[in-house]
Amino acid sequence: MLTKAFLSPAEIEERIAQEAASDKDRKLTPEQIEAIYSNGTNILVSASAGSGKTFVMVERILDMIGRGVGIDQLFISTFTVKAAGELKERLEKRLTKHLGQAETDEERAFLSDQIAKIGTADIGTMDAFTQKLVNQYGYLLGVSPTFRIMTDLAEQTLMKNEVYADLFNDYMQGKDAQLFQKLVRNFTGHSKTSKAFRDLVYDIYSFSQATADPEKWLCQNLLKGQIEAKPEQAKNELLDGLKDGLLADFLAFLRDHLGIAQREFAKAKYLNNVSDAIILLEGSLINDQTDMEDLLKQLLTLSGGTGLTNMTRPKDEELKAYKEAYNKTKNEFVAQLREVDTQLTVLEVLTKHNDDILPMLELLQSFVLDFSDQYLQAKIQENTFEFSDIAHFAIRILEENPEVAVSYRDRYHEVMVDEYQDNSHTQERMLELLSNGHNRFMVGDIKQSIYRFRQADPQIFNDKFQLFLENPDAGKLILLKENFRSQSEVLDATNGVFSHLMDQEIGDILYDKTHMLVAGSQKQKEPHPENETEVLIYNSDESSTSEDEEGPDQAISSGEISLVIKEIIKLHEQGVRFEDITLLAPNRNTYLDLMVSFEEHGIPLVPDEYKSSYLESLEVMIMLDTLRAINNPLNDYALVALLRSPMFNFNEDDLTRIAVQADKGQFYDKLLAAHTKSGLHPEVVMQGLEAKLTLFTETLADWRDYSKCHSIYDLIWKIYNDRFYYDYVGGLPRAEQRQANLYALALRANAYEKTGFKGLSRFIGMIDKIIASGNDLEEVTDLVPKNAVSLMTIHKSKGLEFKYVFVLQMNRKFIGHSKDGLSGKYIINREKGLGIKYLADLKDQINTNLPKLNVVLETLTFQENRREERRASISEEMRLLYVAMTRAEKKLYLVGKGSKETLTQQYGTDVENNRLPVALRDQIATYQDWIMALDTAFMRKDLKFTVRFVEDEELTPEAIGQVEVKAAVDADDLSNNRQTEEIERALTVLESVEKLNHLYAPAIDLPSVRTPSQLKTFYEPIMDTEGVDIMDKKEGVQPLETASTFELPDFGQKTKVTGAAVGSATHELMQRLTLSDTVTLQDLTQALSRVSASDQVKARVQLEKLLGFFDTELGKLILANRDKLRREAPFAMLAEDPASKEDFVVRGIIDGYLLLEDRIVLFDYKTDHFTHPSELKTRYQGQMSLYAKALSQAYQMEKVDKYLILLGGKDLEVVEV
């Protein structure tokens, strides 16, 4: 066997010296060499952004393999499946290279063996490993190796709801029913449902599942905070802290003021109250027996109204400023006194109710424990589990079976983990159990820990960091701070921000010289002043921003988008490719607005959502559920998915009417009962639903019969054709991609059957196994531009790098600061457990005739949990900004919005330890405010970024510009080109078939799909292409020509507002309009603002006419039946071409219709100019008949009322056709 000794510390130092003396262009740093070769102890590598941690891991693994450690003797945990695949690929490539350089047969044989074992080595996510372990050893817990992973959220929710409902009923009827009702009411209030209580139970359950031992956590930690809470003690501590804190500061402030005020404002009446307050405060600080509560109330009485307020009107400007400063500071002190008084009141009430809260929460604890157990039993019965179950099974197997744990410890030479900062406590316990105590290699960066929402705990990394830093015998700490990604302009700006912002208090780590980014190469240090980091702020009036627009999910403003577009066009003109530019957004709420604006300016933009899983694409999921339902209609999930799909369009009301036909049983049985009207409530099955049921049952029966004697490939195409589903997705956004996905599904089914496997059931089973394993079928190539600007979330960008980066919405409020942030009725903390708001009845404490006087009180644990959660949330936001800023290679832009006047004046110059004060950092609610506070407090030369406010005048269309598009090639210029003999022969052949083409023109020119607009020649007189003017029909009219001329668009021309553009905008407005009992002009204006059209086009939309429509009988009918309204509804149907007698598909979009019980009311908006309504009635008679026929066939309903809503005349007209 191949064996080589590992390097000693002295040999590692020698390697470091040799590397330093080498003439390599890019040398390994001493820390990288240490990380690659150190051994014999636990190692924590703190790797800053761009420091080459993946390179270090690969080199370390290769070094161990080169010393005789087999790849199967390593446990390597990655954060994602993709990262595992990339690591395996790198290792295989490098080992193959080493194999070619091997000098001995023994070495070649060993390396060949390692390459062969890469596929089965333990390199992957922790989820993948635990599944593998439970598959092998699950029998020790009674878990079958054929278990299935529940990846469908709907399936999980349904099973949880069933368990919860049964348990809830048991508790409502149990011995503690009265206390349980009080518990439920505490969280549901006056709600008629227990949903709020159910959400609490689910949240506690989910939180516990992220711990290493959920049952232990529920028993020991869930109520820990409440058990340890001592309101009386907290009250005394609060009062004790008043003397040396708030009251002493208030006294010093009043004394200073009185000395000046008696001279400058000698006759002011408020000074008597100031003197009395000073006397009270001085007495309290001298006398230890002072009743602090009584003192507090006296001070608040003195300061009530204008008691301590300086109401004088000095003429001197300095005195005026002094007066205002005094009043402001005084008000702040009084506000703090009132806050203390409120806290004392709450603590007093909590003291009286503390004995009532704990029994109630103990009952909640019992409920959650019972729910957790019964939910697990339900999953065991179905042999289907969640990822967290498998992880806990794996922990139990290793803890309860020492021989299994020892076998793994003996197997692994090293236990390695990447992205260690994002580990959960469950994962950490697994690593402890697999390790022998001194063979762990952990790589990560706490500054990039951004996954708390996945229960990752950065404190795990931090504890290890501090332990190894303070006690080297416990393990070796290696810091990789050299950055090999970014230019010095990006690194300097990042260091400038976080050296003044991040520390242990906020951010969880002290950002000092130890953690500062350092350029790893000389080339990175070369100055490029033009690439200095820019903070670009769209200068807007804050009063124009409502509270509803603020918060974590606020929309991006048009000014910010214009600002970004202008900078991108400038970069493009300088020769920067679009693919080198990336936009980083806090979430996907901004995507639509950005895509619309970028398209208007001719800039290609690709959001990350394009790179979605093939099996998770909506159209493929619908087809898979269709196949599942055909294979087994008793599969409730698949059946309901098929019913709800666009193929059958059952809505929630329809499904409810079906569900009430039986108390229990499968949904398919209820559906059949509804169809035959033999269920419990046949009266609720109306005519429209009855027609839907008939169509569905007949179609499903037909498909099931067809599947028995035809291939899956043929079945899939029959489904596409029977319900026009393939055509339907062709009318949706990204139609080409969707149709390619559906086409690929049919091809893959065909390929599957060619391997010898037959049957729908087997095919579905194969797909389900792929999904359960977390894998996917090979993606169909995305039909997106290659040279395009990228758009992704900051979370998605982690681990990636881009030349030019725009960080968007710097003004977005953090979750902890938004009005919805931490305002719920409970907060869960890992250490202190559950903190709640308690609904206390104060009737006995307050003299009142009311039957109850309920007041919501924040328990001590709730307050403590909120403080910790808020601080943890702000720290993660700071780390998220660090991730965003360190993605850039060349230049970084930080983009936001705000008032220049406010942002430049609201922060002071106070600093603490060369950082912004902790209180200020904690109070600030946005990235932008952090940046502006730094800009005010520190010198620009220390920050290395510039702040520029951009005005509306700089964002006019002329100032922004447009992407230049190369002129189209003029076909006439090619007329004299030389022609080869092959081209001449081809032209001859083409000319010879011209006669045949003319003879069979109707059939040849017949497209497989037509729209109603293309069929106007079937049912109306001759008309122009715009469909505006009706002309006299002439003899000898030639057939419709289908010339193949393709004119390239001229992007340089000035946009001309056409009638078609106004019509499209009007249609989109009516589609986007939110309907209520009444429609106002404001509603229409808001809907118009969301229309994706130019301002010139929007200006031509006649809102007054549209508003008048809702005063007509048809408009009132629509408002009264909003739940039955369908808008912009796609349809497809077969029709016969009169010339060729060939069938073709008619496909189009219906503006809208009402699906009533006895009839369908169809309507269509027309913006054509007219002098008399009868003109348009005649013109669109055939088109409306076509729509009516399609609806009649789809819903099996004969009566269809047809209306045209005419907007192109002097007055609005509603005409029945």
UniProtKB/Swiss-Prot annotation:
Do you know which SUPFAM superfamilies this protein is assigned to? P-loop containing nucleoside triphosphate hydrolases, Restriction endonuclease-like
Limits of the UvrD-like helicase C-terminal domain: 515-799
User: What cellular-component terms does GO give this entry?
Assistant: cytosol; DNA helicase complex
The reaction(s) catalysed by this protein are: Couples ATP hydrolysis with the unwinding of duplex DNA by translocating in the 3'-5' direction; ATP + H2O = ADP + phosphate + H(+)
What one GO molecular function would you report for this record? 3'-5' exonuclease activity
Write the Enzyme Commission number(s) for this entry: 3.1.-.-, 5.6.2.4
- Residues annotated as binding ATP are 47-54
Has keyword DNA repair?
yes
Print the keywords alphabetically.
ATP-binding, DNA damage, DNA repair, DNA-binding, Exonuclease, Helicase, Hydrolase, Isomerase, Nuclease, Nucleotide-binding
Example GO BP: double-strand break repair via homologous recombination
**Which cofactors, by name?**
Mg(2+)
Q: Which residues form the UvrD-like helicase ATP-binding domain?
A: 26-487
Q: How does it assemble?
A: Heterodimer of AddA and AddB/RexB.
Q: What does this protein do?
A: The heterodimer acts as both an ATP-dependent DNA helicase and an ATP-dependent, dual-direction single-stranded exonuclease. Recognizes the chi site generating a DNA molecule suitable for the initiation of homologous recombination. The AddA nuclease domain is required for chi fragment generation; this subunit has the helicase and 3' -> 5' nuclease activities.
Q: Which family does it belong to?
A: Belongs to the helicase family. AddA subfamily.
Name-wise, this protein is: ATP-dependent helicase/nuclease subunit A
